[in-house]
């Protein structure tokens, strides 16, 4: 892995709405990760405009080699409160396109974008999200197909030019790959499971 910043962005708005404990777990979890030397800096975002502005401007003399996003997700999407981000951010007409491009230009050639969110890489839309983001940024994209908590299941990675190796129905408890309705909760014996205390993606995931 090349030199560069390791950053976490989390949804700080969760502290002000139920379940508040989840919001505080994200906030104080970043302190633990910093103390363990896993990340260099964390930012609590109120929306993706602020998040991307931080990613585009923080310590601009250094590249970024890893971004973890801690927040809510759905199939092919991530959220800060009600502000959603999906693969449409890659279109020049998107309101966050310029900020995203500025962030993208800071990524190292072997950068990792890890979405520690529920379901984001699940179903067909999650696979399409991972593929589009990897191809556009040149980064390795990682995320989950299950609802995550302490256990975080269905963790998969995709590199530029690759096709997803996991089933588009993985993690689904109701619906189809094209029209998902509900996902399973993560468990210790579900596929590709880590915990929230793990800071590294195992080989083969």
Model-derived regions: residue spans:
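A domain-level signal for caspase-like cysteine endopeptidase catalytic cores
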Residues: 1-54
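Active-site-proximal C-terminal subdomain of hydrolase catalytic domains
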Residues: 113-205
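Hydrophobic, Leu/Ile/Phe/Ala-enriched alpha-helical segments that form helix-helix packing faces
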Residues: 28-36, 55-59, 103-104, 133, ...
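Catalytic cores of nucleophile-dependent amide-cleaving enzymes
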Residues: 66-70, 75-153
């Amino acid at each position: 892995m090349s030199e560069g910043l390791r950053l976490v962005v989390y949804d700080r708005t969760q502290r002000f709405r139920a379940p508040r404990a989840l919001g505080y777990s994200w906030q104080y979890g970043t302190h633990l990760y910093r103390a363990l030397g896993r990340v260099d800096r964390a930012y609590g975002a109120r929306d993706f405009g602020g998040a991307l502005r931080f990613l585009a401007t923080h310590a601009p003399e250094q590249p970024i080699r890893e971004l973890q996003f801690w927040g809510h997700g759905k199939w092919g999407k991530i959220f800060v409160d009600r502000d959603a981000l999906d693969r449409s951010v890659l279109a020049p007409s998107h309101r966050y396109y310029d900020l995203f491009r500025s962030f993208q230009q800071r990524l190292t050639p072997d950068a990792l974008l890890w979405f520690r969110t529920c379901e984001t890489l699940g179903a067909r839309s999650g696979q399409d999200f991972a593929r589009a983001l990897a191809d556009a940024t040149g980064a390795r994209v990682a995320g989950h197909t299950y609802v995550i908590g302490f256990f975080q299941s269905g963790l998969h990675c995709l590199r530029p030019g690759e096709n997803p190796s996991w089933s588009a129905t993985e993690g689904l408890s109701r619906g189809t790959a094209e029209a998902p309705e509900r996902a399973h909760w993560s468990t210790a014996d579900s596929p590709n499971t880590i915990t929230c205390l793990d800071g590294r993606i195992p080989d083969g995931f």
